[in-house]
Amino acid sequence: MNYLNILFSIICFNNLFGQFDYQNYKDSILQLRLQHASALIDSSSSILNNDEIKEFTGVDYFSLDTNYRILATFQKSIGKRFRMPTSTERKPWYRIYGYLIFEINGIDGKLIVYQNLALKKNKDFKDYLFIPFRDATNKIETYGGGRYLDFKIPDKNSVLVDFNFAYNPYCAYSSRYSCPITPEENKLLFPVYAGEKIPVGIQNH
């Protein structure tokens, strides 16, 4: 099972309206993080090459904080397809799928939710949505280019958004990759002290 599938299974398990089991939630996230770190140092499956694996010393995270596990309002608003800018010349087709409106620690936030049109054709990812975001921790505690959240097409207007699952794009680990550039509209003016930090032992590209 790959990283995205693990992520989806945990998000689905900790559903919005079910009973919240904090210990199971904590254990599941810790297991996910261990699997992610193990995959990065396994040369047979790592996104890193051998030289980068030697340089890599670990994945760092903010402490788990349920204040960043929030209820948000999802507003579906499908836009026209467009070419998403990336860190290279590659420009994959995306479209805006909707908006998330929420509050964290008394501060209002809004993020655009995107759909990758190539992944939409894959039956395993036809419900996959993508949220690139930046916040006030970038270039200090987190990767300067922002972080990502994965999301599934919801069937309700009230949805669970958990920033403890925020993860780095591949470009945070290696400049060899092509990563979507976080749109300026998805820059949060407040810090999000949850999810992945800058990778340990790797230059912040």
Predicted features and spans:
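Start-of-domain marker
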Residues: 20-79
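A structural detector for beta-sheet-dominated domains
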Residues: 71-73, 103-105, 112-114, 134, ...
